[in-house]
Structure formats: C-alpha cells, structure tokens
C-alpha cells in the first residue's frame, strides 16, 4: 500500500510548478519496519524526490510520529498523509494553489472515496457524544434513528453539493497545511496516542485561520472505521474521545 501511495505522490508532484516543487518526503517508522521501508525508498531513487527515513524507535502514537516530520519541516507547505491514501494526479497542485492564493487559509481537506468508490466524509462539524459512540460501536439500529444528526456531523450536504466551504474539523489521513501554522500551534497534541489528535489539531488550526474543504482535491482512502479493528481500538477511541471533550467541551446530543 505504501508503494502505491508514494507512486501517487510522484505522479501528483509532476503537476506542481518548479518553484513549489516537493522538497522532501519523510517516512516515519512507528514500528520496526526499517528494512521494508528502505527497500521501498530505494525503488524510488530514480525519481528526483528527497525521501527521508526516520525511525521513531517505538510506537509513539499517530500524532507524535507525525510531529517528528512537522518539527523538521522548513517548507512552505506540509502534507500530513496516511500510507493508505492514494492521491489523484491534480490534487496536490489544487490544494497548494488554493493555499497560495488565500492568505487567511491555513489548511485544506479533500473529497474522498474508499477502495469501493463509497464516499468518505473527511470534513466534519463539532461531534456529539451520541453520534461518536453510535458510529464507533457500529450500532446500525440506533444509527437509522439519528441519521439526520450523523448527516449534519459528516457534512454530507456540503460534500454532495461539491462546493468549496469552510469547515471546523478535518481528517488526519490527509491534511495539507501551511507549515508556519502547524509550528504555531505546536503540531499534534501528544496527549492523544490514537484517535482525535486530528480533531484537536483542526480546532487549534481553526483558531488562527480558515480550514477549507476542496471538492476538486481528490483522494482514495483505504483505512478508517475503528469498530472493525477490535475492542482494543474501541477502548483507545473512547479514551481519546473523553480527553477531547474534557478539553473542548461536551456535546451530548
């Protein structure tokens, strides 16, 4: 999957003007995958991309691992992206061009589908406890009864209208940001090991600028859905959710 993700970056990078070309790609090893990752990097040695490998030494968690790259970045723009994301050819330039021409915007989020072409709703409104638990626990019977709340949370109307709009929260699977803004807010909050670190970062970024949903910036995301990953992930989800609500305010319904 990582090799395919890198290939999509290589293709998309070709659409970017030379003065804004990608300075480097940083691969953070949050496990013990050095041999595999270095082999993948070697496969891309023929391309004019500076791909750097960093070992976290241990599993630091999603946000802390990304902070390694964020703190080292001296580029104008910084893309936070998962290894299970395929970027469409025009997407990087679509996002960078928008950031270039809108000084008040600090981050942009794409439209997304999964591997089966189902829509993924990456931009969201402020969550409620009810909606989060129903989705995390995959409670289908209850989900039908609160569908309007879920649609509002997932900004489904916004996505289906295919218009550029300002949003409050975006997914950490793909966040194209101004690096200065990331440095100003301190990157991801280290108190979140997994889940809600992107919600927290979004809110902090939104305090200093606008976050925009760009329907013409497109990706395929093959991950997501904590309910399918077992009880351990559900427990981590709930623990991070409590931290998030304690800091930013509880919304029950």
At which residue positions do the language-model features occur?
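Conserved donor NDP-sugar-binding/catalytic core segment of glycosyltransferases
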Residues: 86-122
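Short, well-formed alpha-helical segments that are part of the catalytic scaffolds
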Residues: 1-17
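Active-site-adjacent helix/loop segment of glycosyltransferases
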Residues: 199-203, 207-253
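Glycine-rich, basic loop-to-helix element that forms the pyrophosphate-binding segment
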Residues: 55-73
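A short, conserved alpha-helix in the catalytic core of glycosyltransferases
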Residues: 159-162, 166-187, 191-218
């Amino acid at each position: 999957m990582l090799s395919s993700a890198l290939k999509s970056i290589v293709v998309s990078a070709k659409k970017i003007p030379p003065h804004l070309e990608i300075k480097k790609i940083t691969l953070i090893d949050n496990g013990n995958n050095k041999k595999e990752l270095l082999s993948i990097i070697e496969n891309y040695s023929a391309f004019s991309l500076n791909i750097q490998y960093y070992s976290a030494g241990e599993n630091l968690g999603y946000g802390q691992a990304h902070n390694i790259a964020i703190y080292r970045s001296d580029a104008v723009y910084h893309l936070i992206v998962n290894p299970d994301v395929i970027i469409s050819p025009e997407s990087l330039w679509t996002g960078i061009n928008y950031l270039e021409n809108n000084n008040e915007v600090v981050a942009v989020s794409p439209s997304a589908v999964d591997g089966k072409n189902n829509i993924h709703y990456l931009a969201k409104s402020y969550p409620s406890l009810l909606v989060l638990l129903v989705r995390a626990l995959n409670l289908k019977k209850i989900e039908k009864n609160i569908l309007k709340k879920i649609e509002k949370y997932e900004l489904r109307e916004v996505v289906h209208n295919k218009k550029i709009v300002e949003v409050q929260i975006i997914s950490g699977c793909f966040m194209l940001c101004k690096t200065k803004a990331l440095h100003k807010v301190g990157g991801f909050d280290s108190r979140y090991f997994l889940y809600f670190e992107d919600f927290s970062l979004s809110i902090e970024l939104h305090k200093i600028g606008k976050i925009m949903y760009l329907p013409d910036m497109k990706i395929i995301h093959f991950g997501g859905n904590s309910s399918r990953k077992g009880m351990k992930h559900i427990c981590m989800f709930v623990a991070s959710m409590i931290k998030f609500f304690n800091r930013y305010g509880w919304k029950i319904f």
